[in-house]
Regions:
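Juxtamembrane transmembrane-helix termini in multi-pass membrane transport proteins
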Residues: 1-56, 116-135
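Interfacial loop-to-helix junctions that mark the boundaries of transmembrane helices
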Residues: 54-65, 125-134, 156-164, 184
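Interfacial loop-to-transmembrane junctions
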Residues: 147-170
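Membrane helix-loop-helix hairpins that form the core translocation module of multi-pass transporters
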Residues: 28-87, 144-155
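Juxtamembrane boundary at the C-terminal end of a transmembrane helix
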Residues: 174-184
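Small-residue-enriched transmembrane helix starts and helix-helix packing motifs
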Residues: 1-12, 35, 80-107, 130-136
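Small-residue-rich segments of transmembrane alpha-helices in multi-pass membrane proteins
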Residues: 40-44, 95-108, 163-175
């Protein structure tokens, strides 16, 4: 559940949803974009969760909590900066399926959600649930973006939403960090 909520909040105003909207407009196939987004997001989250499963047992519980706090603080801090427009992938000539799947995978693998997935997977006995939750949570935002298209997506009040969500991430990150350091 934590991965679902964190991913859904983090994707609002993020570049992955924006790229999904761009590709949906280009190919006029929102269903294809959504399917490839699900595949790409699950692959990226699965890799992050697998790494978390390897790292988690090597860390003390406080270290796991501190790592999650850091992930939330980084995601929250990044939310205060405007999202840079994603590469439109205009020069990619590998077809709609491959362009969408690879483009979204590359973008998703580098975003803050994956660090959150890694840290959540490190703390749980079933790391795959972090990947599944993050994938579904991300799709909660990416599906509407793909269905709306870029122009409608960008008309949403994304900046104030990013700031509000960033504030929430920062608050939770600070509380978790203070708890991990035994300061509260």
């Amino acid at each position: 559940m934590a991965a679902f909520v964190a991913a859904a909040l983090a994707q609002i105003g993020d570049r992955t949803a924006w790229l999904a909207a761009i590709l949906s407009d280009r190919y006029a196939k929102p269903g294809l974009v959504i399917a490839m987004a699900a595949l790409a997001l699950f692959a990226a989250s699965g890799l992050a969760a697998a790494l978390g499963a390897v790292i988690g047992p090597k860390l003390a519980p406080n270290a796991q909590q501190l790592m999650l706090a850091l992930a939330l603080l980084l995601q929250g801090g990044g939310s205060f900066f405007p999202a840079k427009a994603p590469e439109r992938l205009d020069r990619w000539k590998i077809g709609a399926i491959a362009t969408t799947a690879l483009g979204l995978f590359i973008l998703a693998f580098g975003d803050g959600v994956q660090f959150i997935v890694l840290t959540l997977a490190a703390r749980t006995p079933v790391p795959a649930l972090a990947a599944i939750g993050a994938t579904i949570g991300s799709l909660v935002v990416i599906v509407p973006a793909a269905l709306m298209g870029e122009a409608a997506w960008l008309r949403l009040p994304l900046k104030p939403l990013r700031i509000a969500i960033g504030t929430v991430f920062l608050i939770f990150g600070i509380v978790l960090a203070l708890g991990a350091l035994r300061l509260v």
